[in-house]
Amino acid sequence: MRLVSKLLKALLVLLLAFGSVRYSCDNYTSGELQICKYTAPQHYRAIIGGRFPQVIKYSDSLVAKYETVVVPRVGSAVIHVKDTVEQKVVPSVIRTSRSSLSLVYTKVYPRVVKYAFIAESSLCRWYLQLCHQYTVYVKPVVINLYYKTMIKYPFLEHAIYSVQAQYKIMETHVFKYYNIISYNVQVWNDKYGYGRLSRNKIFIRMKSTVVEHLIIWYRYVNNRCRKMWRENLCPIINKSRERFAYHGGVRPESATTDPDDESIFYEDDDVDEYTETSTIVLTVTQTANSALDLKATPSASGLIVDECDMSMEEMLRNDFMSWKITIENKLSNTMKDFENDINEFAQEKLDHIQPTLADLLKRASNTSQTNFQIITKAIMDVNCTESVDPKTNKTIWFDQNNTQLPKYMTRELMREYFSAAHSQFDALSQEIRAHLRKLADEVNDHVEVLRQENVELFEEWADVMITEWSKNLAYVDVAVNEEKLADLEKEQRKNWKDFMKLKRQVIKTRDTLMEHPVKLDSLQSFVNTVQQSLKTLSHENGEYLYILRSKANLEFQAREALERQQREKEKAESASMKASTEFELSSSSFSSSSPSTASSCTASSTSTASLLAVEKTIALEDLQSYYQNVSSTDSL
């Protein structure tokens, strides 16, 4: 089985290679290459015809038989199948598709839309309920518990910010080493990997050859696909469209149209017929000399009679209700209008201040990160190496990477770095707080201005409406005849009571508007977010600077201990050198003394000789103490 698959793969590769070569020969080289000659079918036909003429005769007979027998039969079968498909299959497919579409549009789609709307409404309702439960019950409890815990156990907050600071340090180191590794990998790739390979001439030639062959093969496949599309698929698609348009056309409806006819794609049976009756009232002015005698139509006269026959009680009730509804609507919308004005102003201020504060917070964060990097680099420069410039004979210092430092890192310079970090962050914090205070002052001032404007507008409107309404009620009292006064007295008394009730309600609404609390939820949420972000940045900056200060202090202590040890060592070496010099001077003075004193200094010479013998075996740091002991012996 594996052998068969390998043979098939090899055959496929050979066919593809042969096809690409023939395409190149036919379209680009015009048969000038030798490979085009050897891959041409005429070449092999001539060779085989010269050696095996029977094979050529047999192949020609097969081709003639194919053209005379097989092609007509296959063509007739194809024509038969084509006619069958066009006459039976295509109309049935069209009818089925139309009925399916009609079923989907009339029954399936409305139900899907209905249930989807129900599901969406249920999901939205459930989501809103969940958000409400979380906002009202869960979030305040969690926030309260968090702040109580932080107040009761402050070390937890310190631990949290310490962990965050350590995480930022770790992130900085990881990013640093990642960049180093990436750079080294890139350098290695450029020296020994693909970069080196891409500079090889043989690889370049092979790559260009492969790319050229791939382009040729792509063009060949693309041309074949285009040719197949134009010659085979496009005619079939065009004929199918024509037949679908022919079978799917809507015929005009006639008196003998069958209701079950499938050519009617859609029929609307729910259209209700209706008639509209219009009444025209004609008004005619007749003069004394006119001979016209015009009469109103029955419908017009009936309409006029209905309006005239309306009772006074109904007219009063309708008029009173119109005034009452207008005033009640205004009272109910007064607070909403005021809140809408406030919200529009708050949104305008929020759109104006939000980019500024976001930029300031970003600057504060970037400034902190920059100062952290500067201080971290300064801490690394504490442990430096001292050297001497051979040209200027000045002391210079190098860091761990053997890079010369511009300045020697001292505690005073480190304090300046920390002071600059604190001052820069404090300046940005003060600027952010100043913007917040300015925003609060502007909002409060404008809220009072809007409140005063709305109150004045409401007072003016209420004064006009109440006055006009009271005048209207008074006119009704005067216009009513004495005969009907007894019947309408009760109604008018009730109207006056309702009028006074609404008047008191107007006054109460005005007082409420004067003291109505303003809820700026979006603006307050934004201010809280900015304050929380600033608090978080301040905590992170303080904690991380504290950690860096401790680390810098440890580095300075280690360096000072090393310098102290070095100074002590140098001091001990200088003392040893001084002692050895004094000893040599005393030895030379004893050897140059007079012979008369030789007998008295025998013990001293003996001790000096013993000292010279012992000096070779004792350590350098014990030389001074040994010399003092010998001097005391000599003096004695």
Swiss-Prot record:
Domain of life of the organism encoding this protein: Eukaryota
Positions with biased composition (Low complexity): 579-607
Major site of localization recorded for this protein: mitochondrion
Coiled coil: 433-460, 551-584
Region of interest called Disordered, as start-end residue ranges on this chain: 565-607
Keyword Disulfide bond annotated: no
Disulfide bonds: none
Gene Ontology biological process terms in this record: sporulation resulting in formation of a cellular spore
Function: Involved in spore wall assembly. May be a component of the mitochondrial RNase MRP (MtMRP), a ribonucleoprotein endoribonuclease involved in the cleaving RNA transcripts to generate primers for DNA replication in mitochondria.
Family: Belongs to the SHE10 family.
Record's protein name: Outer spore wall assembly protein SHE10
